[in-house]
Amino acid sequence: MISLNNLLESIDSLSEARLLGGEPFLYPKIDKVLELLCKSDKVSKIYIYTNGTIKIKSNIIDSLKNSKITIEITDYGEELSRNKYNLIDLFNKENLNYVCHEPQNWTDSARIVDNKLDDDKLSKMFKACCVNDVFTLLHGKLYHCPFSANVTNLKALFASDKEYVDIKNSKKSELKEKLKNFIFGRPFLEACKLCLGRDFTQELVEPAIQLRKNIPLPSLNS
């Protein structure tokens, strides 16, 4: 919560906050996160993405009753999204904002590969990326995109302090300037070297396929 509070104190506005997983409703402090986001005048909209696999605990229902919040259910079918109808009934009963839809446009853009692109091609790929400004807060650090956050978390990339801003441990007096430099200061990320790109040209893939075992990952670590 310290990281989110520090971030909100250091920005002018946040048009959209997204709570993602895994499954965000498994996070035991989600009600505290929502309380912080909802009370901030800087935050315009909040989206919570759920896969409909679990029931929502009764103690967080009240925290969902805010006009800023929309809950988005991705329907992966009755076997996986087995609590979808329970959620829909609950959201209708409590008059909560929600949408429900099937998986949309899953592309081959999440695999970790050593793409061996030169700096010019990496810059063009980053410029064309549809998530190059979808900043991701993970474990107290703010990354430029979800891919950068995840390859670092998986230890496929040794992330220098240029790859993220340490929101939790930075001095508040310095954080706003750090964020400005981070947002506008780079032609591409180190994580781009492990990415296939995300510019809507990648092939569509079947959604929600699960691995039965871990697979080896390429690495840029020395």
Annotated model-derived regions:
Residues 1-127:
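Conserved glycine-rich "GG(E/T)P / GGGxP" loop and the immediately following alpha-helix
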Residues 113-222:
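Accessory C-terminal segments flanking Radical SAM cores
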